[in-house]
């Protein structure tokens, strides 16, 4: 059987129409990625999202799947400025000042976790379709407190 290749493409993320980041991603869950990025940048903590859409207008809209806007009706605060595109690193790279990032972080409550449940999590990861066909992706998984997977997303491994 021929080898399968994974795709990676750039995606621009806009908040209320203003460009806030350009990142590389495996296409598929673009709206979730855009909203998640805004949440981790600290601009959606207390702000409702009115809509998420591709930015294409008119007859060319079908081809504008690399540009997503998160609309809050102008209620979101201005994101921390970045010096260039968002990288696939830790997320700090490209920010103008670390202090700007820390200003928007909220403390997390302590959440003790059963070590035995943690040990079982690796065995509960199923459904890596892209990895099965390409062997070239990694996954991120969110688990509930009992160790059951809630959501799994795959992306190109570096």
Residue map of PLM features:
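Intrinsically disordered, low-complexity regions enriched in acidic/Ser/Thr/Pro/Gln residues
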Residues: 1-140, 145, 151-152
């Amino acid at each position: 059987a021929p080898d399968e290749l994974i795709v990676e493409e750039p995606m621009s993320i806009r908040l209320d129409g203003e460009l806030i980041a350009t990142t590389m991603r495996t296409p598929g869950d673009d709206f979730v990625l855009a909203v998640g990025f805004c949440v981790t940048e600290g601009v959606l903590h207390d702000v409702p999202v009115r809509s998420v859409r591709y930015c294409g207008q008119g007859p060319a809209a079908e081809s504008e799947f690399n540009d997503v806007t998160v609309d809050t009706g102008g209620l979101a605060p201005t994101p921390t400025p970045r010096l260039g595109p968002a990288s696939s690193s830790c997320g700090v790279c490209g920010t103008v000042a670390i202090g700007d990032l820390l200003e928007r972080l909220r403390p997390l409550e302590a959440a003790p976790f059963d070590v035995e449940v943690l040990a079982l999590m690796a065995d509960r990861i199923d459904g890596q379709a892209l990895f099965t066909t390409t062997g070239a992706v990694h996954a991120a998984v969110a688990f509930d407190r009992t160790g059951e997977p809630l959501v799994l997303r795959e992306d190109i491994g570096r």
